[in-house]
Amino acid sequence: IARRQRQMCIRDSDDVILRYFLKAKLPDRLVEDFFTFFDVVKSPLAIRSSSLLEDSHYQPFAGIYNTYMIPYLDDKYEMLRMLSDAIKGVYASVYFRDSKAYMQATSNVIDQEKMAVILQEVVGNQYGDRYYPSMSGVARSLNYYPIGDEKAEEGIVNLALGLGKYIVDGGMTLRFSPYH
């Protein structure tokens, strides 16, 4: 498997890489957990990465890996299929061309990366057949650029209206330390 991963890193297109990941099977023990999750969460989901390199001090990877949004459906089996594909897609995105280019530009090695996948309930309002989140945010346990009385260990939060594109793209956000 490790040899195949290295080969994928070198030559395969994003679509080929994604197809390999989509063929993989998630552990059976997760299926029951996901059905229980669907019984509790009745709104769209964001399926995101949470990785060591995303919290890197000097070259954070926030926004580099794919995030998938899936709608809430009454059909739990279709929800399971979409969730399964989204989880695999997040993991596959580590090996995508843009991710590899950023990794190389920041002198990181793919073997250093460790990743979990986060399932987040999207909180917002429905307008017709569309669903809009109210706010998005990024919270960091360390604040690398404290201002005034802030301390690095107090963390930092950036909030924006709607989806998190403003945050990832460096747009105007509300920045605050939870301690102040």
Give the ranges of each region predicted by the language model.
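Conserved mixed alpha/beta core segments that line enzyme active sites in large multi-domain catalysts
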Residues: 20-180
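Single conserved hydrophobic/aromatic residue that forms the stacking wall/gate
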Residues: 1-10
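Low-complexity, highly charged intrinsically disordered N-terminal segments
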Residues: 16-17
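A conserved donor-nucleotide-binding helix/loop in the catalytic core
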Residues: 13
